[in-house]
UniProtKB/Swiss-Prot annotation:
Reactions that this protein is recorded to catalyse: a UDP-3-O-[(3R)-3-hydroxyacyl]-N-acetyl-alpha-D-glucosamine + H2O = a UDP-3-O-[(3R)-3-hydroxyacyl]-alpha-D-glucosamine + acetate
Domain of life from the UniProt record: Bacteria
Pathway assigned in UniProt: Glycolipid biosynthesis; lipid IV(A) biosynthesis; lipid IV(A) from (3R)-3-hydroxytetradecanoyl-[acyl-carrier-protein] and UDP-N-acetyl-alpha-D-glucosamine: step 2/6
GO molecular function: metal ion binding; UDP-3-O-acyl-N-acetylglucosamine deacetylase activity
Similarity-based family: Belongs to the LpxC family.
GO cellular component term of the entry, any: membrane
Function: Catalyzes the hydrolysis of UDP-3-O-myristoyl-N-acetylglucosamine to form UDP-3-O-myristoylglucosamine and acetate, the committed step in lipid A biosynthesis.
HAMAP family the UniProt entry points to: LpxC (MF_00388)
Record's protein name: UDP-3-O-acyl-N-acetylglucosamine deacetylase
Entry EC number(s): 3.5.1.108
NCBIfam families documented for this protein: lpxC
Keywords assigned: Hydrolase, Lipid A biosynthesis, Lipid biosynthesis, Lipid metabolism, Metal-binding, Zinc
Pfam families: LpxC
Biological source species: Xanthomonas campestris pv. campestris (strain ATCC 33913 / DSM 3586 / NCPPB 528 / LMG 568 / P 25)
Length: 303
């Protein structure tokens, strides 16, 4: 039986918001079965809860943001990605600000945080969203697509006219499992170009950005002293983002995802298109005594 998972203990972290630059206190708490992932703005009076739901996405410019009852939660994708990677279904995320902390720009610190809290199995089967028919969305030359597949596979292709991102390092595929996610995807950082900085600052974006939490490129090279963590870190980060964006569907995906120059907006459009097409997907679970799911999660981490 593949059971739902939550945290064993409450755990806290502090950081800055990538776009707001605000200091933010974050607390992750265990949650009961079928609760799902819910963000809680504890700085508001009264406190407002914002479920991790693709239908609540209102912001897709350089991050994924949710709005519910007037309360915003920005830059959810890296934590959502870590939760998906470790198979966590139920958690309460308390925040003292409208944006999650960026940490080092990857989901690695969130993975460490979740493992430190401990992950426990709950007494109910985990629910998966099984893709039954292809679903595709396009925007110009950008494409995002789901197809039926026995497991969870992600493929992504980026196209940047930059010497540090040659064509041979612009494609990545991953057969999803916790170990593959942690090793191959979780440490890939967000990235940005110096030329875009002015655009971002004019829109009050990237105010908390620095080389401590992003890969920064000028016209020719990577400016970070330590260089890259993977030769194709850029496309790996796009997969990290996609895993987080797709987890807003409300369950773990069983299917194949393909992205070509996709981003937060198109990923969200794909999830909405999928959920709107009742014939294209179904809920499935794997209760005790039935077949094993075609996706491997790590054994629970008892902190």
């Amino acid at each position: 039986m593949t059971q739902q998972r939550t945290l064993k203990n409450t755990i806290r972290a502090t950081g800055v918001g990538l776009h707001s630059g605000d200091k933010v206190y974050m607390t992750l708490r265990p949650a009961p079965v079928d609760h799902g992932i819910v963000f809680r703005r504890v700085d508001l009076e009264p406190v407002v809860e914002v479920p991790a739901d693709a239908e609540l996405v209102t912001e897709t410019t350089l991050c994924t943001g949710l709005t519910c009852n007037g309360a915003k939660i920005q830059t959810v994708e890296h934590l959502m990605s870590a939760l998906a990677g470790l198979g966590v279904d139920n958690v309460i995320v308390e925040l003292s600000s409208a944006e999650l902390p960026i940490m080092d720009g990857s989901s690695g610190p969130f993975v460490f945080l979740l493992q430190s809290a401990g992950i426990v199995e709950q007494n109910k089967a985990k629910r998966f969203i099984r893709i039954k028919q292809p679903v595709e969305v396009r925007e110009g030359d950008k494409v995002a697509r789901f197809e039926p597949y026995e497991g969870y596979k992600l493929g992504f292709t980026i196209e940047f006219n930059h010497p540090m991102i040659p064509a041979k390092q612009s494609r990545q595929e991953i057969e999803f499992s916790t170990s593959a996610y942690v090793k191959e995807i979780s440490r890939a950082r967000t990235f940005g170009f110096m030329r875009d900085l002015e655009y971002m600052r004019e829109r009050n974006l990237g105010l908390g950005g620095s080389m401590d939490n992003a890969i920064v490129l000028d016209e020719f090279r990577v400016l970070n002293e330590d260089g890259l963590r993977y030769t194709n870190e850029f496309v790996r980060h796009k997969i990290l983002d996609a895993i987080g964006d797709l987890y807003l569907a409300g369950g773990a995906i069983l299917g194949a995802y393909e992205g070509f120059k996709s981003g937060h907006a198109l990923n969200n459009k794909l999830v909405r298109a999928l959920l709107a097409d009742q014939a294209a997907w179904e809920w499935v679970s794997f209760p005790e005594g039935t077949e094993q799911p075609p996706v491997t999660y790590a054994s629970p981490v008892y902190a």
